[in-house]
Amino acid sequence: LTMKIEEATVYVLSERNGGLKTEQIAEIINRRRLHVRKDGLPVSSAQVFAAVMRNSQVFAKSEGRIMLLLLM
């Protein structure tokens, strides 16, 4: 089983302090095969960006990087 792209993004960011660029997140997701598209193509940075935009309660953007929001 693979994760949803949002879950894979959370997983990747939970390991990295300071956040990552969407290109870096997509590269890690593809390398580790955390999310596999139905058509078999690699996850793109645009898909990561779209997932981040759909989940503004989870992710923050700052200085070109995506970070996890801390939920208290």
Which residues are covered by each model-predicted region?
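Charged low-complexity interaction tracts in eukaryotic proteins
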Residues: 2-6, 16, 20-23, 29-72
